[in-house]
């Protein structure tokens, strides 16, 4: 069975690398501009009067490789923006501005125009301003194009959503993804191009081409989630990206997240799993599996969350609940994420 590690990505090694880097960061300012206590969360923030200024930075990873194969660059900028703004809203912050960074080996005016169109589409959907950026020509360092960005967001101090209030009995509402989003592309490319010997124009069994599926842009959840925060007591927010539902542990680490009511898995994931003979556990640790964002609320508020999401044309479902502990093979587990799928219980460690 093929794994993400076989495709060149070791998420556990990445965790260790991040910890090694973070262990060396010891300096903090000693004046009134202090960082918020959000270590390990989706976004970083500093105090600024009655507000927190929030920063997120991210790129599109190897999705750009598929864009180059298909010679289609107008959607990947939307992915870059989505990866940033969707992280920012996880603490209740409203994204307001973006700066982008593009590193190129060589680039044509046509590709630049496509990227510009995608940037405009992404900032429009996110309701943010693009206020600057950098384009670096690095022919001796890079092949093709890499695109990343940093988003600035703001939130009032008394309105931050940290996830610390998540408790047993709360429900987890899952918002539909548009597909693969921007994570797991290395494994997807290995399955489709190396194992199945397909190309970007090959049609999959459900009718779409490989390029159409892999280049569908990441869903931007800014508008519905900000509306939810205004209308409902939202207790936790999670952007489901690399690592899948493991991301829920970024919120309250003292509870269990039990995912046991998943909707139908999207065709792209079924196709990939079949072609690559990928295990269920590997799929759920690598991909969003059709749920791109989670909202945690008290039981009586779940229907309102679903109503708001549907109003924004994003299907939403109660996919699970918060518990103090879960039972797996006769063993009691605490402080974990449990996914039940195909009559199988999988711990997402």
Curated annotation (Swiss-Prot):
GO biological process, one term: 'de novo' IMP biosynthetic process
Gene3D superfamilies: PurM-like C-terminal domain (3.90.650.10), PurM-like, N-terminal domain (3.30.1330.10)
Reactions listed under catalytic activity: 2-formamido-N(1)-(5-O-phospho-beta-D-ribosyl)acetamidine + ATP = 5-amino-1-(5-phospho-beta-D-ribosyl)imidazole + ADP + phosphate + H(+)
Entry EC no(s): 6.3.3.1
Keyword match Ligase: yes
GO molecular function annotation: ATP binding; phosphoribosylamine-glycine ligase activity; phosphoribosylformylglycinamidine cyclo-ligase activity
Superkingdom of origin organism: Archaea
Keywords in alphabetical order: ATP-binding, Cytoplasm, Ligase, Nucleotide-binding, Purine biosynthesis
Compartments where found: Cytoplasm
Keyword Disulfide bond: no
Entries under InterPro entries matching the protein: PurM-like_C_dom (IPR010918), PurM-like_C_sf (IPR036676), PurM-like_N (IPR016188), PurM-like_N_sf (IPR036921), PurM_cligase (IPR004733)
Example of a GO cellular component annotation carried by this entry: cytosol
Pathway(s) this gene product operates in, as recorded in its UniProt entry: Purine metabolism; IMP biosynthesis via de novo pathway; 5-amino-1-(5-phospho-D-ribosyl)imidazole from N(2)-formyl-N(1)-(5-phospho-D-ribosyl)glycinamide: step 2/2
Membership in a protein family: Belongs to the AIR synthase family.
Protein name: Phosphoribosylformylglycinamidine cyclo-ligase
Gene: purM
């Amino acid at each position: 069975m093929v794994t993400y590690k076989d495709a060149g990505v070791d998420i556990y090694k990445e965790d260790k690398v991040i910890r090694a880097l973070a262990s060396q960061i010891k300096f903090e300012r000693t004046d009134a501009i202090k960082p918020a206590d959000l270590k390990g969360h989706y976004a970083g923030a500093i105090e600024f009067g009655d507000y927190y200024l929030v920063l997120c930075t991210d790129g599109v990873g190897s999705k750009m490789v598929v864009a180059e194969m298909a010679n289609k660059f107008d959607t990947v900028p939307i992915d870059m923006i989505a990866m940033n703004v969707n992280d920012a809203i996880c603490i209740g912050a409203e994204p307001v501005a973006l700066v982008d960074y593009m590193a190129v080996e060589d680039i044509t005016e046509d590709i630049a125009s496509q990227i510009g169109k995608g940037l405009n589409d992404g900032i429009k959907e996110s309701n943010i301003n693009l206020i600057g950026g950098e384009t670096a020509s690095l022919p001796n360092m890079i092949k093709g194009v890499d695109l990343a960005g940093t988003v600035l967001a703001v939130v009032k101090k008394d309105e931050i959503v940290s996830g610390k209030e998540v408790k047993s009995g709360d429900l987890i509402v899952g918002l539909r993804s548009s597909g693969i989003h921007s994570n797991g592309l290395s494994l997807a490319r290995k399955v489709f191009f190396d194992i199945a010997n397909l190309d970007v124009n090959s049609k999959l069994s459900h009718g779409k081409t490989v390029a159409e599926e892999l280049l569908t842009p990441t869903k931007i959840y800014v508008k519905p989630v900000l509306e939810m925060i205004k209308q409902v007591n939202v207790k936790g927010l999670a952007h489901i990206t690399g690592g899948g539902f493991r991301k829920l542990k970024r919120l309250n680490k003292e509870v269990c997240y039990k995912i046991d009511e998943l909707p139908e898995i999207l065709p792209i994931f079924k196709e990939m799993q079949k072609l690559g003979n990928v295990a269920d556990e590997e799929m759920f640790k690598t991909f969003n599996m059709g749920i791109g964002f989670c909202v945690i609320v008290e039981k009586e508020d779940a229907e309102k969350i679903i109503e708001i999401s549907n109003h924004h044309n994003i299907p939403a479902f109660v996919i699970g609940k918060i518990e103090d502990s879960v039972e797996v093979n006769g063993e009691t587990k605490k402080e974990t994420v449990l996914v039940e799928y195909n009559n199988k219980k999988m711990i997402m460690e």
